Regions:
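C-terminal catalytic lobe of FAD-dependent flavoproteins
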Residues: 29, 123, 132-133, 149-263, ...
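Active-site catalytic microenvironments for nucleophilic, acid-base chemistry
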Residues: 33, 81, 85, 232, ...
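Hydrophobic/aromatic beta-strand patches that form the interior of the parallel beta-sheet core
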Residues: 42, 72, 209-211
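Hydrophobic (often cysteine-bearing) scaffold residues that line and stabilize catalytic clefts
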Residues: 23, 81, 222
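Flavin (FAD/FMN) cofactor-binding and adjacent substrate-gating region
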Residues: 1-43, 48-55, 60, 192
Length: 277
């Protein structure tokens, strides 16, 4: 199934139900679907502190105070900050930076599936996969950093990644073509000190619900985390199911994948489609 795997491979676990998704489009789609169903987003609003109140919480922000009966803490790298504002049972989250190398589409099909090595203490390891647009990539690395906003790539780490990619026998049985690398980027996942996904109501802070320490495989876990939290919250607060909930969100037009006739029709309906980006 994977003829290009390194000759050092002795065994593999195949997950035929696995797949890939664009994480950016998934987040946008979920947000748009939430708006369709009545959610209101408060953009550019920074929560500076949380105060326990008689019937819930008061959230102090740069745009005034907000009163709420419940809080879902899904603040990623900063989930520990908000958790620790209301709970005596403190947690600590470290930013674990991961860096990637992306290759041009001309590299072609190296693997037919996502290939992940044996995991280590820092995570699942440096994997090889594709974007939904067909770009091959390898990553992420794993480096704990102090700056939670530090999403810059580093020459030292990228050099190690390139050295690994150019060698025989890491994941592939031949060196990867480094002249086909078109970009690199970094991201940070929220590593909880005890390697735990914390998905629960806080014992000493009623109606404060954590989704904290969600690192890899957090994206894969997100539907199950959402269902679990929805169940916990609805049972605790005696919520009723919204019968008019619409779970569907229309996809967007992929302009480069449609026919010339379809493009002309879209431009007639909306001239902005005629702007080349």
């Amino acid at each position: 199934r994977e003829p290009n795997l390194t000759d050092r491979t002795v065994a593999a676990l195949w997950a035929p139900t696995g797949g890939i998704v664009c994480p950016f489009n998934l987040a946008i789609a979920a947000g748009e679907n939430a708006i369709m169903n009545g959610v209101e987003f408060q953009f550019e609003t920074e929560a500076s502190s949380i105060e326990k109140a008689k019937d819930g919480y008061i959230i102090h922000t740069n745009k005034g105070d907000m009163e709420t009966k419940a809080i879902v803490n899904a603040a990623g790298l900063y989930a520990d900050v908000f958790h620790n504002m209301v709970s005596e049972n403190k947690i600590h989250i470290t930013a674990r930076k991961g860096e990637y190398l992306f290759f041009d589409k001309s590299v072609g099909t190296i693997f037919n599936t996502t290939v992940v090595p044996l995991p280590g203490k820092m995570g699942k390891g440096i994997a090889a996969s594709y974007t939904i647009n067909g770009n091959f990539f390898i990553g992420p690395t794993a480096t704990d950093v102090e700056d939670k906003e530090g999403l810059n790539t580093t020459a030292e780490i990228l050099d190690k990644l390139k050295e690994m990619a150019a060698s025989d026998g890491y994941l592939t049985r031949f060196p990867l073509p480094l002249n086909k690398v078109i970009t690199s980027f970094a991201g940070a996942r929220a590593h909880e000190d005890h390697h735990e996904f914390i998905v629960q109501e806080l014992e000493d802070a009623p109606n404060f619900f954590d989704a904290a320490g969600i690192e890899s495989p957090g994206l894969t876990s997100s539907p199950a985390i959402g269902e679990r939290l929805a169940k916990i919250i609805s049972e605790k607060m005696h919520l009723e199911k919204k019968e008019t909930f619409n779970p569907k969100r229309a996809g967007f037009v992929r302009f480069n994948e449609i026919s010339d006739e379809e493009r002309e029709k879209l431009i007639e309906e909306n001239p902005l489609y005629g702007n080349v980006i």
